[in-house]
Structures are given as structure tokens and as C-alpha cells.
């Protein structure tokens, strides 16, 4: 890591590092989507995954933990969007069940780390209100 990069707090945050992995995973998967999805689901999934990293980075540069916590909450929401899009991509036949599960597992790591970071930044809060990201197994 370069000397100047060490000044970026977000590089040391596990949630940002996991977000970066998610972005690479999403980028690899959407390459095989049909061309007609280029400005639809392909673009949306990439933007949502990128938003995880962007919001953690932006929040880490803020002057207060309260402000940072707000950006962590937005990053959490962006990760949830990726989870939703994983189901839609699977429903359309763009990804396999195994690929969907890989995306959901990556999102689960991010929301867990985001929730922990949120609690650390905002001790008075009990954490981001987290509902299950996974649908009941009755209808995959």
C-alpha cells in the first residue's frame, strides 16, 4: 500500500474490503447477461454493488461518527439491493442457483459487518434494523 493510500481510513475497514469483493463478483456475473439488460439489471447491480464501497468511503471521510453511521446505513441498503437483484437475475435465468447463493453469501457478510460498524459508530443504537435477506426456502 502506498504511503498516501494509508491516509484513507476506508481501506482498513473490512466492510469496504468485502464490498470490493462483491463488486468484482457482480461485475464478473453481469458480463454474461443479455445485451438488452445492459441499461437495466446489469447497470443496476453494478451501481448497487459500487454504492456499498462508495458510501463506506464517503462516510469514513466525514467528521463525525453520526454522519459516518448514516453512510453505513446507506451502504447496507445498497447491499440489500444486490440481494434483491440476485433473485431477479436468477428468476430470469441469467445466473444459476449456485451463483445466486454466492451473491447472497457475499451480501450477508457485508450486512453483518455494516451492522457491527453501525453499532460501533452509534453505541446508543441497537444496530441497523435487519430483516432476513433470504426468502423462505418454499419458493427458490
Identify the role of each PLM range.
Residues 1-140:
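Amphipathic alpha-helical assembly/interaction segments
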